[in-house]
């Protein structure tokens, strides 16, 4: 492929297509701090705060977006997830970048080079070695805490298993970094009853709580123990991200005790029994979240680990997940209604991966809003494969049509990379351009200060108020 001849691609007005958009972005959105309420960053790396050292570590070690792009470009797996040298892996990524035009990877790559390293050149083979050296010189001295502060990241919420001892979150709290780092309670492993890994996981929880989980009542007691522990350490969010259709069925509490005991005896459970157990657990957890004042998140609509060959070679999160087409909105309705009926429905965010279900999810969340809690039920930001210009615009437009965009809690990275935070800038530029276009078309009043305040709320204030971050320990 020929060389791309464009040095100043990321300009001050990148993605801003009118004077109104420029004013909204530069005067209202640009300088706001970042609230990243869902990501997969390592609390250990932040606590230890050692320099990242190498751009390949930062960009390519766990980034399944880039892995998919490299595979699509014909790169051999050895240069993606294999044992090729860091430099060779970077060179293969540089070969791939020019071929990512119109994929969000192209925009993200150039934004990250610009914001963290002040590099204007398009990454490509002819300048790859120079950029590799320059980025590494910066990363040899930049620690995770410094990278976060550089981007004005005020709050991040990591994703953590209930058995985590949160030692690194405690260390971070004592270190008094610019960025506050809070855990998120993600109990996915509790839902795999009927599988061998469930029994192994129960033993792991027993080690945490120091008592036997020989019945369902003791499991709930153990869950209470871990939720209390997370709450004491600043947690106010949960997350649910199991592959497959969201399901919810009727159950009887006594029956769940019997199902748990049956599994403990090694007797194979029926599919109905598994769903009954999961439904009971969902209700119990959600009521506990409500009791604690937490926000619950549901990431729905993904089919994971489609490629057995790569899954066996690399493991989960190899870049072999995709959009699913599950029917699940009736089950979600029944679940939310069961909690709302007893006034035990916590603040809730749902993220759907299938864009054909955008209006379905947006309208479902609007069914359960409550007086006194603005935006209680959130249809979340464009997620994963939808986290790109078209997907973000569609999410903003559907939410505007079906709900209140003004109460939206804004963007998150859902990332494993400390260099991913320009995605907030990306979202903010798109948001400002969408609102400016409405002004130009006469669809909203030409009141820049009013709309600017709305943009500030979406990008920052709404999240602060929704999660009550100012009230954290």
Identify the function of each model-found stretch:
Residues 246-262, 280, 298, 302-346, ...:
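Catalytic core of soluble alpha/beta enzymes
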Residues 295:
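Residue-level detector of anion-binding/catalytic polar loops
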